[in-house]
């Protein structure tokens, strides 16, 4: 817990240091780092394939009959007869293969693919994905994938115990897909460029439009950009401009960024991320916990000798309850540093901090958006 508080405090100090320096040095970024081109979005690809070469960790044909059907169909396509009994070798696994086709990708380029088990395979480590076609939402084949599978997790199994670390039923094939079909692109024929902010914000959108208009006025003699809303900035193509060169110049312009105050909480992992612009109104916080411990200690009762009795188990339950009262802390926080210091003074665990932040938000004292994941 001490390590957690040290990390939170360190993040708070760094964030507040940046906030204190804001008047002299504002956070700036290139437009390419905070926005993307609407015409340059990714497209998702999907396919069904087989992974072979597994060391007894593949699908069982009885529980996953589709794996055997797929294997027989593949062998028949290769001209190999599949007449005979059922194989018991668990060295094949059926998988779903997914990939993202980047914008403007040309035939011959390579993609990373992700494979995920469909059947009861226990591990894909050491396997090889055989030739698998990847299709888009329109049903057209855009890439073909094949290669060795890399799995980050591991599994060790004995007769009486199994140890698993990470996920062994999913993996990646780096550069395993080759693009065979090019997506239709009308970028050169476009009359404007539409930039989409990755973190929508009206202030940032206006600043992007102003920076682009300053560049366009000096280069083309007039403004060309307009902020449509908090997410989109539309740039009209000047008559004498080439869109590719225009985009190359625009994406390298420097703009001052701004983000709304947010507190992001992941209740499953206990992760708390507090933005540097978070403000807290004066509020009093008290935190106490009730711990209930239930212990089962079954007692074995043996019968008397030669009594023809039976051994019985008598349940015995011990219940202990302990309630710890928390101190009351007055959090008068104009900044993030005061908020973190106030929570540390109470001495609560991460799950307690999550509950406190939710309570502060309900009381109307947290001047930020609370995001629960």
Swiss-Prot record:
The basal body constitutes a major portion of the flagellar organelle and consists of four rings (L,P,S, and M) mounted on a central rod. GO terms for molecular function: structural molecule activity. It comes from Rhizobium etli (strain ATCC 51251 / DSM 11541 / JCM 21823 / NBRC 15573 / CFN 42). Disulfide bonds: none annotated. This is Flagellar P-ring protein. One of its GO terms (biological process) is bacterial-type flagellum-dependent cell motility. Transmembrane segments: none annotated. It is found in: Periplasm; Bacterial flagellum basal body. The lineage of its organism: Bacteria, Pseudomonadati, Pseudomonadota, Alphaproteobacteria, Hyphomicrobiales. The gene is flgI. It comes from the Bacteria. The keyword Signal applies. Belongs to the FlgI family. Residues 1-26 form the signal peptide. One of its GO terms (cellular component) is bacterial-type flagellum basal body, distal rod, P ring. InterPro entries: Flag_FlgI. Keywords: Bacterial flagellum, Periplasm, Signal. Assembles around the rod to form the L-ring and probably protects the motor/basal body from shearing forces during rotation.
